[in-house]
Amino acid sequence: MATITAAMVKELRETTGVGMMDCKQALAENDGNMEAAVDWLRKKGLSKAAKKAGRVAAEGLIGALTDGTKGVVIEVNSETDFVARNEQFQGLVKMIAQVALKVGADVDKINAAPVGSSTVAGAISDAIATIGENMTLRRAAALEVSQGVVASYVHGAVIEGAGKMGVIVALESTGKTDELAALGRQLAMHVAAANPQALDPAGLDPDVVRREREVMADKYRQQGKPENMIEKIVENGLKTYYKEVCLLEQAYIHDEKGKAVGQAVKEAEGKVGAPIKIIGFVRYALGEGIEKQTSDFAAEVAAVSGQK
C-alpha cells in the first residue's frame, strides 16, 4: 500500500477544493493514485449533490451578456447569498451566460451544451460537489436584432455582468452604434428602476387590463358616479395606468422634466442619425417568484446541534 504524504493530500485538496480528511481517505482508497482519487471524490461529491437537489435555491446571481446585436440574461440560483460571493460560482455564472449567447435561451439546450470535456449541467454538478450547495440554472432569455444593438445593465453587480438584477434591451436602428449603445444602456437602467410590464398597452395581458378596468369601474360606482360618466373616467384611469406599466409611456428617469420614454427615444434619433425602434426588453430580478424556506432561530440551532 502506497504511503500517503501530507504533500499528496495538499495537492489533492488544492485540485478539488475538498476537505483534508476526505482527500486523505480518497488517496488511501485508491493506493495513492491522484487521478483515481479525483474520480473517487467526484463520485462522492456527485452523490452529495444529489441529496442537496431538494433544497430551495433562491439566492444566486443574474448574469447579463451582450455581443453587438444579441444579448442574453440568465438566473443561476444557489441556497445562500454567501455562495453568490464565491469566485467559482461567479465564474460558473459568466460561463453559462457565454454559452447561452451561443446556443440561445432554451434552458435544456444550455444545460446540454458542451463545456470542455463535460456539459453545462456537468459543470453545475461539479460546483455543487465542490461548494456544497444546491445550484440550478433557473431561466434564460435572449434578444436579437438584425441591425442595431442589444444593450445590458446589471444592478448590484458583484463582478462585471453579474449581480442581483439584469436587464437587456434591444434597439433596432441603422444609426451610429456607439450612440445607440449608450442610449440602450440608459434604457436598460430605466427598465431596472421602473420595472415596466410591457413595451406598450398592446403588449399587456388582456386579463390584467380587464381586471384593472373592472376595479376602477366598481370603485366609481361605489362613489355614486353616474354610469354614463364611468366609462370616460375609467378610460382616463387606464391612461394613467399605462403610464405606470408601459415602457414607452413611462416618465424617463434620465429626463428631469419627466418626458415619456417613447418621446426621449424619438428625440435621440437626431443624435443617432436614424430611426430607432425598441424591439423588446427583459428584466430579471434575483429570486422573484421563488418561495424561500424559513425557519426560526431555535430550530436552526437544534438542526446544527443534531437535536430534534
Curated annotation (Swiss-Prot):
Q: Where in the cell is it found?
A: Cytoplasm
Gene3D superfamilies, alphabetized: 1.10.286.20, DNA helicase RuvA subunit, C-terminal domain, Elongation factor Ts, dimerisation domain
Chain spans, region Involved in Mg(2+) ion dislocation from EF-Tu: 80-83
One GO CC annotation = cytoplasm
Recorded hits in Pfam families, A to Z, give: EF_TS
Q: Which CDD domains match?
A: UBA_EF-Ts (cd14275)
Which molecular function term from Gene Ontology is one that the record holds?
translation elongation factor activity
- Keyword annotations of the record: Cytoplasm, Elongation factor, Protein biosynthesis
What is stated as this protein's family in its record?
A: Belongs to the EF-Ts family.
Q: What does this protein do?
A: Associates with the EF-Tu.GDP complex and induces the exchange of GDP to GTP. It remains bound to the aminoacyl-tRNA.EF-Tu.GTP complex up to the GTP hydrolysis stage on the ribosome.
Question: Any idea what this protein is called?
Answer: Elongation factor Ts
Q: Which organism is it from?
A: Rhodopseudomonas palustris (strain HaA2)
Underlying gene: tsf
